[in-house]
Design a protein with these regions (language model features):
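Glycine/aspartate-rich loop-and-adjacent alpha/beta segment that forms the canonical ThDP
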Residues: 81-214
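Thiamine diphosphate
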Residues: 1-27, 76-83, 88
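Short C-terminal domain-edge/linker segments immediately following a structured domain
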Residues: 17-21, 43-48, 101, 126-132
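Short, glycine/charged-enriched secondary-structure capping and boundary segments
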Residues: 2-4, 28-31, 110-113
Length: 214
């Protein structure tokens, strides 16, 4: 498994193309699907308002391994993307990169608006750009005046049905509170972990191979 390979310290780069659902089989709900999104297995209707759970924070799950380089990237920030790929290539250990990108068909976004949607994800704090290197956090793009997360939601048809529901404002407010609190937490972690990498047996001689684990 991915977690096992990271825990053993193998040097590799794992890139997640995060389009927030099982899109190649027809837009089913996944752990990565955001709150309020309309999918075939968590639809918006009389009794449901789409997916009710928060999007799984796979980036923090991977960062918890502590011996890893973890980063988020977006289509709209290509230089940030390239720098993180270069850093992952040079990192002596496992690297995990989460790339947020629209599925234009099932997000119901026009082909020429995918990059703009990515930009809004970053500007609304829905998809913060940051990296974690062995426990040291760094927010690579700070947003001084974030836009409301509603702007990001309105840019995609997958939220349209939910936004018409009587409980829409409650869902919007909950998501806004979540993304704001998460961003503030990242800034706090950046300050708290500055120049304080997690210490451990990260040298190559301590990497346990599958053969040794048998």
């Amino acid at each position: 498994s991915l977690s096992g390979a990271v825990e053993r310290g193998h040097k590799f780069i794992y890139i997640v193309y995060d389009n927030e659902g099982y899109m190649n089989t027809g837009n089913q709900r996944s752990g990565s699907t955001p709150t309020g999104s309309d999918t075939t297995t968590a639809p918006v209707g009389k009794k449901m308002s789409g997916k009710v759970q928060l999007k799984k924070n796979i980036v923090e799950i991977m960062a918890a391994h502590e011996n890893v380089y973890v980063a988020t990237v977006a289509l709209t920030d290509t230089f940030d993307f390239m720098k993180k790929i270069e850093k992952a290539l040079a990192f002596d250990g496992p690297s995990f990169i989460a790339a947020h990108s629209a599925c234009v068909r099932f997000w119901r976004v026009a082909d020429d608006q995918a990059v703009e949607t990515s930009k809004l994800a970053v500007e609304t704090l829905y998809w913060p750009l940051y990296e974690v290197e062995r426990g040291v956090y760094r927010v690579t793009k700070k947003i001084k005046d974030p836009k409301p997360v509603l702007e990001y939601m309105k840019s995609q048809g997958r939220f349209n049905a939910m936004l018409k529901k009587p409980d829409a404002q409650e869902i919007i407010d909950e998501l806004q509170q979540y993304v704001t609190a998460r961003y503030e937490r990242l800034l706090a972690l950046e300050e708290a972990t500055k120049d304080k990498p997690v210490r451990g047996p990260w040298s190559k001689k301590d990497v346990q191979t599958d053969e040794h684990a048998m």
